[in-house]
Design a protein with these regions (language model features):
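N-terminal capping/linker segments that flank leucine-rich repeat
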Residues: 1-24, 235-248
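Leucine-rich repeat
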Residues: 8, 30-33, 52-57, 76-80, ...
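Conserved hydrophobic beta-strand positions in leucine-rich repeat
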Residues: 12-14, 37-39, 60-62, 82-86, ...
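Eukaryotic tandem repeat interaction scaffolds
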Residues: 111-201
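Leucine-rich solenoid repeat scaffolds
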Residues: 198, 203-248
Length: 248
């Protein structure tokens, strides 16, 4: 299928969203000047290693396809600094080379049956937002606490039973979505989240709330619906007294 988009030397953006491609036309890989490439919604099952030639890309959208793997060559796209969309595919793992994208700001790998995130995830210190919702994760790597610029972390709908205490080092974190997991508690190491505003814990089998929750200085909203936590606990009472919206 020919690509009916401008192909001049100055072309920097190519939008092939929902074209029913099945495979990526070879001529796409020849456009080495591309900065933005959108391939979402095409039923893609694989990608050519030739993607390595698109070194000027800062945004790549591979969402809503049928990918079971992403080639390791993606790690060579070190100009990929803005957005990488991998959501709604069939990925069980992410390529290890992904962590070479240390300046990437936004990564959406949600809606995949991911069983783990890369163990050295923490080197991706440019990340401001990380989405890995609706997968098969049971925990996070310890290195996640090194994502020093992370502001939003979305982990809804996984199988997470425990979290590393290193998350308490995420000094820029504003929003943490943990709803619909299997958490029975939170580690004390998470007490150091000075900017956390919204914490969603709904639909987790929580046994108790740690006392440090009441001491989070910026917390504005805590969602505890469908957790079994009652309104008569000291943590809930203290948060409510401070003006934090606690949903039960």
């Amino acid at each position: 299928m020919a690509v009916a988009e401008p192909a001049g030397p100055g072309t920097e953006s190519l939008n092939l969203w929902n074209r029913g491609l099945g495979t990526v036309p070879e001529e796409v890989w020849d456009r080495t000047g591309l900065r933005v490439l959108i391939l979402a919604g095409n039923g893609l099952t694989g990608l050519s290693p030739r993607i390595a030639g698109l070194r000027r890309l800062h945004t790549l959208d591979l969402g809503h396809n049928a990918l079971t793997a992403v080639p390791e060559e993606i790690g060579g796209l070190t100009g990929l600094t803005r957005f990488l969309y991998l959501h709604d595919n069939r990925l069980t793992v992410l390529p290890r080379s992904l962590t070479r994208l240390t300046a990437l700001r936004y990564l959406n790998a949600g809606e995949n049956p991911l069983t783990a995130l890369p163990p050295d995830l923490g080197v991706m210190t440019g990340l401001v937002e990380l989405r890995a919702q609706h997968g098969a994760l049971t925990t996070l790597p310890e290195s996640a606490g090194e994502l020093r610029n992370l502001r939003e972390l979305w982990l809804r709908g996984n199988r997470i039973t425990e979290l590393p205490g290193t998350l308490g080092a995420l000094a820029e974190l504003r929003e943490l979505d943990l709803r619909e997991n299997r958490l029975t508690g939170l580690p004390d190491g998470m007490a150091g989240l000075p900017l956390l505003r919204r914490l969603d814990l709904r639909a987790n089998p929580l046994r108790r709330l740690p006392g440090w929750l009441a001491g989070l200085p910026s917390l504005e909203k805590l969602d505890l619906r469908w957790t079994g936590v009652g309104e008569d606990g000291p943590v809930v009472r203290e948060l409510a007294r401070r003006g934090c919206a606690v949903l039960l």
